[in-house]
């Protein structure tokens, strides 16, 4: 083999080696490009998931803010809630009607009153309409010393009226807070005349005369809920005076005092009427 032939074959081998290297580099480049594209997809997916997570966090903060606002506005704080659903079997005559029975359970409080509710809602859906009714309602409330609430809860259960329950309980608690603050105000203003034997949460306030020992007035302030769930205050005046004073009361002032007090309430309102009565009874005309 002459020198030219050897040189030609050496060049062909070198070209073949270079071609193999080029193919290897091309394959590596394709793999790198594929890896880069995969990385871009993963990065894009991670970015989208991160944005979605940020949106969820933002929505959660918004819901927490709304929940806090509604709790402050209404006074209700719901602590626990659960729900179950059962599809109700329907008869042949109701085959076009879908019925779902929802069982709800929740507990919470409205200021000092705690409650537990269990109720069932039957949802009925046809081609024309969708409706729902409460089929059962059970209410447990504490503290139980509020006799008005016990009677009210029984009526709400009978009527299966959740809206009435929440609305009436809200206003009942508002009136209780107002009564407590009013009693506290007069106790601080007239400490030697006003007595709250059961504290500011009591429904009774005693007014004792500092000039005539044995003369007392008792304000009985009840908060009532009627059959329709309307909440309103009911204030009565009781008198405690010595028997001898009753015999000397020719103008029947003591006897007619409760009726006169109700008239005073209608003219002046609760706080002004109580203040006027206390000043009159204690001899404080300032």
From Swiss-Prot:
It comes from the Eukaryota. InterPro entries: CENP-P. GO terms for cellular component: inner kinetochore; nucleolus; nucleoplasm; nucleus. Component of the CENPA-CAD (nucleosome distal) complex, a complex recruited to centromeres which is involved in assembly of kinetochore proteins, mitotic progression and chromosome segregation. May be involved in incorporation of newly synthesized CENPA into centromeres via its interaction with the CENPA-NAC complex. Residues 1-73 form a coiled coil. Keywords: Centromere, Chromosome, Coiled coil, Nucleus, Phosphoprotein. It is found in: Nucleus; Chromosome, Centromere. Belongs to the CENP-P/CTF19 family. One of its GO terms (biological process) is CENP-A containing chromatin assembly. Component of the CENPA-CAD complex, composed of CENPI, CENPK, CENPL, CENPO, CENPP, CENPQ, CENPR and CENPS. The CENPA-CAD complex interacts with the CENPA-NAC complex, at least composed of CENPA, CENPC, CENPH, CENPM, CENPN, CENPT and CENPU. This is Centromere protein P. The modification Phosphoserine is found at residue 38.
């Amino acid at each position: 083999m002459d020198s030219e032939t050897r040189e030609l074959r050496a060049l062909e081998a070198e070209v073949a080696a270079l071609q193999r290297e080029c193919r290897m580099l091309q394959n590596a480049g394709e793999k790198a490009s594929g890896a880069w594209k995969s990385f871009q997809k993963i990065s894009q997916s991670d970015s989208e998931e991160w944005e979605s997570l940020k949106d969820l966090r933002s929505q959660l903060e918004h819901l927490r803010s709304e929940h806090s606002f509604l709790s402050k506005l209404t006074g209700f704080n719901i602590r626990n809630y659960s729900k179950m659903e059962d599809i109700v079997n329907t008869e042949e005559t109701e085959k076009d009607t879908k019925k779902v029975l929802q069982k709800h359970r929740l507990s919470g409080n409205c200021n000092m009153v705690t409650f537990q509710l269990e109720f069932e809602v039957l949802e009925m859906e046809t081609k024309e309409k969708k409706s729902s009714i409460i089929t059962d309602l059970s209410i447990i409330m504490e503290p139980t010393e509020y006799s008005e609430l016990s009677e009210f809860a029984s009526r709400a259960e009978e009527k299966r009226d959740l809206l009435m329950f929440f609305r009436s309980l809200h206003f009942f608690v508002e009136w209780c807070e107002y009564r407590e603050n009013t009693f506290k105000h007069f106790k601080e203003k007239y400490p030697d005349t006003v007595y709250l034997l059961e504290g500011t949460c009591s429904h009774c306030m005693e007014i004792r005369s500092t000039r005539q020992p044995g003369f007392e007035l008792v304000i009985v302030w009840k908060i009532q809920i009627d059959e329709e769930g309307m909440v309103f205050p009911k204030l009565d005046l009781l008198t405690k005076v010595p028997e001898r004073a009753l015999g000397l009361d020719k103008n029947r002032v003591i006897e007619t005092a409760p009726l006169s007090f109700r008239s005073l309430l209608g003219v002046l309102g609760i706080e002004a009427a109580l203040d006027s009565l206390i000043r009159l009874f204690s001899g404080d005309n300032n």
